Design a protein with these regions (language model features):
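Sec-dependent N-terminal signal peptides
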Residues: 6-12
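A structural signal for leucine-rich repeat
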Residues: 370, 391-399, 420-422
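Sec-type signal peptide cleavage vicinity
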Residues: 2-6, 20-261, 269-279
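N-terminal segments that cap or nucleate solenoid repeat domains
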Residues: 256-313
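Structural signature of tandem-repeat unit edges
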Residues: 287-304, 322, 326-341, 351-363, ...
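C-terminal capping region of solenoid repeat domains
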Residues: 420-438
């Protein structure tokens, strides 16, 4: 009678990088009564060099660095007698286990593959299939090594090499994106992807693709009907395409150049175009908008020289009022990334704004924030040192329709000149819904 091996899988997951690997501190335990202890080391991460331009886009993320509760390693085995079989080892936060068993004959050498690929699952019937809603390229596909001896399989990722790259798409947290590619071969695939991807950015605003972009390959990122990024992996920037085991970053955040390409003055036509751009963004769910540039292009309107983007938010409010549309009030989270000064009447009746974040502003003009009725939060990232409040209405009626506006100040604001220090929920003769120091 032929002897059949049914065995439990022993996993030793080692760091796999191009340059080094970490040694395990633990040692394997003796086999007793057919059971084995599973030993797990650090997970091999991609990593992003903090000195590279890519790491400055959005929130850098070196990727997965350790095994987590629920992680799985999949083993497939093909026996001449028992055919194709698959088993999933599951990590519970401290050890690995599987309820499955794999069988082969004593006198045969089975065909075995082991890999970490979260896009796959093992069914109750012992077959491997893509998880619902998953496509190759949406997760890693890292192959491991194995040895079979005396009916025991030992798996290790030591020395494993990624034959693919990672593309980190920097977007807005929890936002769903449509990503289309050309000449992109997903990790774990042997041919290029033909279907678009639907990716949801994580809490850091990042979404990922794993695979190889050939020289000349393209990637397009859209939110609804709005194209956020079109990129080509040109021969100049990426000769021979993306490199194995390397992470790349693509900026697909909804960013507006407040300088309109380096201008200091804007036209009525450019204002109209900006209003339509903002309208398109908002109506396609792009409600976190980043504006770059310190010296923004301005337009003389009603006797005031106002940055064209701020003016466009005012004009958009009037447009929605004329159309009797109020569903977009208080929907936009606006970030003025580089601006250092808010001019007179800059944010005037901007009812579409939910929050305004100003990392670098230190100077505020008279009536700089006036009657933004749905503004929930105003954030100053730097210490405000100058407020030109000739009218006494610099923060007039902010959050009037929603029972007040929250204020966030730099923690060092308490060390500013006396008039610029907050007291309780009062700052600059204005009662705020709350004041938070960060």
């Amino acid at each position: 009678m032929k002897k059949i091996y049914q065995y439990i899988l022993l996993v030793v997951a080692m760091v796999a990088t191009a340059s080094c690997s970490n040694e395990l501190d633990d040692t394997l335990q003796p086999v007793e009564n057919g059971t084995l202890q599973f030993v797990v080391g650090d997970f091999p991460a991609f990593g992003e060099d903090p000195q590279t331009r890519a790491s400055s886009l959005g929130t850098p993320d070196e990727g997965k660095t350790a095994w987590e509760n629920g992680d799985q390693i999949i083993v497939t085995l093909t026996s001449q007698k028992y055919g194709e079989q698959a088993a999933a080892l599951t990590y519970d936060g401290s050890s690995w286990s599987t309820e499955a068993s794999l069988s082969y004959l004593e006198n045969e050498t089975p065909s075995v593959s082991v890999f970490y690929a979260p896009c796959y699952e093992v069914t109750e019937e012992g077959t491997m299939q893509l998880r619902s809603g998953m496509q190759l390229g949406m997760t890693e596909y890292l192959s491991g090594n194995y040895e079979i001896e005396n009916g025991i399989m030992t798996i290790t990722f030591e020395g494993a090499i990624r034959t693919y790259s990672r593309l980190r798409i920097a977007g807005v947290a929890n936002q769903t994106l449509t990503v289309t590619t050309t000449d992109f071969t997903p990790a774990g695939a042997t041919s290029v992807a033909t279907e678009p991807y639907t990716l949801t950015a994580d809490d850091k605003g990042n979404a990922y693709l794993y695979g190889i972009f050939a020289e000349g390959a393209t990637v397009t990122v859209k939110k609804g009907d709005v194209t956020l990024k079109d990129y080509t992996f040109t021969a100049e920037k990426n000769p021979n395409g993306t490199e194995h085991n390397k992470s790349y970053a693509l900026d697909a955040r909804p960013v507006i150049d407040g300088t309109l390409g380096g201008k200091t003055e804007a036209t009525e036509e450019e204002l109209a175009a900006m209003v339509e751009l903002l309208k398109n963004y908002i109506e396609n769910g792009l409600t976190t908008i980043i504006v770059t540039g310190n010296n923004q292009a301005k337009l003389l309107k009603d006797g005031y020289l106002t940055p064209v983007v701020s003016l466009a938010f005012e004009q958009l409010t009037y447009a929605y009022q004329d159309e009797k549309i109020d569903s977009y009030w208080g929907t936009v989270d606006l970030i003025y990334q580089d601006v250092k000064e808010i001019v007179e009447y800059e944010f005037y009746c901007c009812d579409v704004l939910k929050s305004i974040t100003l990392p670098n502003v230190t100077t505020v003009g008279d009536r700089g924030f006036w009657a933004c009725y749905y503004l929930e939060t105003l954030t100053f990232g730097s210490v405000v040192t100058t407020i030109n409040d000739n009218s006494g209405e610099v923060f007039y009626d902010l959050g009037y329709k929603i029972d007040g506006c929250n204020l966030v100040l730099n923690s060092e604001q308490t060390n500013a000149a006396a008039d610029y220090q907050p007291s309780g929920n009062t700052w600059w003769n204005t009662e705020w819904k709350s004041i938070t120091l960060k």
